Amino acid sequence: MATITKRGDNYRIRVSCGYDVSGKQLVQSMTWKPESGMTARQIEKEVKKQATLFEERVQNGTVSACGSLKLADFIPQYLENVRGEISVTTLENYKRIIRELIIPALGHLKLKDIKPLHIQKFVNALTSGEYRLDGKGKPYKPATVRRYYVVLQSILHNAYRLELIASNPADSQKIKLPAMGEQTTEIYSKEELAEMLQCLDNESLMFQVLIHLAINTGCRRGELAALEWSDINFNERTIHISKSLYKIKGEPIQTKDTKTHESRKVAIPEYCIKLLKRWQAQQAEIRLKLGTAWKGANWVFIQSDGSVIYPTSPTLMFSDFLKRNELPHKKFHALRHTSATLLLVSGANIKNVSARLGHAQITTTNRYVHAIEEADRVAGDILGNIVSDLQLKKA
């Protein structure tokens, strides 16, 4: 209900619109001044009418019900709104970016006061290295800047959709983002792959299984880490990919749906089946030796006590392996890219490769085709130069 307070010749009308996360009341107000010559009775009647009209405007959104709402105070509502729309790990990444970057830079501003200029300054500060999560002071890569910007854009779009602001100041048409430049996909050449596999023979059996499955299935690291022995069909030579592993700070390791929320079966070669059988037998020996100290369940990839590995373990183990063997450093995800590229180079159907990798859209798989086409153009130019040289010598 609206409250009316007389201030000199004017009347202040205030409408409560709830409380922010700190318990502070949120209020929208207006000032009404009577026309000269109005009687006291007319003024009383008119100010009540104005109060009723103003309250209706606040309630139906014509006037923002949270005109004083700050960005930092809106964020808890935003996070609740998008919960369920994005994955658990994405939500945690959003929280980290919001906590360490967005709130320190813009959280003090009222939603209605945020302009494209504020967003542009934020983007520029990320690009220049003024804002860093790790305090290094180095500029973020364009792709990283764009990811952080998308979070801010999403917050303000949510506020716009709820009619808390008249427009989204972070609209992509209003903000200049750093150019992406040419995007390259990390892929192992056949020679690099051969050298890596040779070094792999000296590693633990579990790590050998991990890397061979990564290459042969193209699975994401979280999907591999989440594998259980029940997912392996030794007779059909297939692996059932239905979940992914994730870890939130302060909480135990958990599983979730795959990135596309769909399961898939992936065929693997006979030698991988043999490796898996050897590792299963070795794991059984470890379990027997540990006895009651065994904490595992049915996981394929385990820690020393049998419990499941961390979702980040494949990356850390792979990085350590490359360093110890003085091999070129590439991300663990490069094995997935390599798997897709080798299949396409060998003539596999792109739709089949897309399904095998668990891509939601075939356009995602197309980036590997572009890489292959570029390599083919380079090869064509090399051959062309050779033939041209031969023709010149002949002349």
Q: Across the structure, where does each feature detected by a protein language model lie?
A:
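Catalytic-site neighborhood detector that most strongly recognizes the C-terminal catalytic loop/helix
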Residues: 179, 187, 245, 357-382
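Active-site/catalytic core of tyrosine-dependent DNA strand-transfer enzymes
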Residues: 190-194, 236, 244, 269-328
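C-terminal catalytic core of tyrosine-transesterase DNA break-rejoin enzymes
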Residues: 161, 212, 216-223, 313, ...
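N-terminal core-binding DNA-recognition domain of tyrosine site-specific recombinases/integrases
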Residues: 3, 38-43, 64-67, 79-164, ...
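Basic, Lys/Arg- and aromatic-enriched nucleic-acid-binding interface segment
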Residues: 138-142, 146-148, 161-227, 235, ...
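C-terminal secondary-structure termini that scaffold catalytic or DNA-interacting sites
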Residues: 236, 249-263, 267-272, 278, ...
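N-terminal DNA-binding module of tyrosine recombinases/phage integrases
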Residues: 7-10, 17-120, 281-296, 307, ...
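DNA/chromatin major-groove-contacting recognition/catalytic segments
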Residues: 122, 195-199, 250-255, 370-395
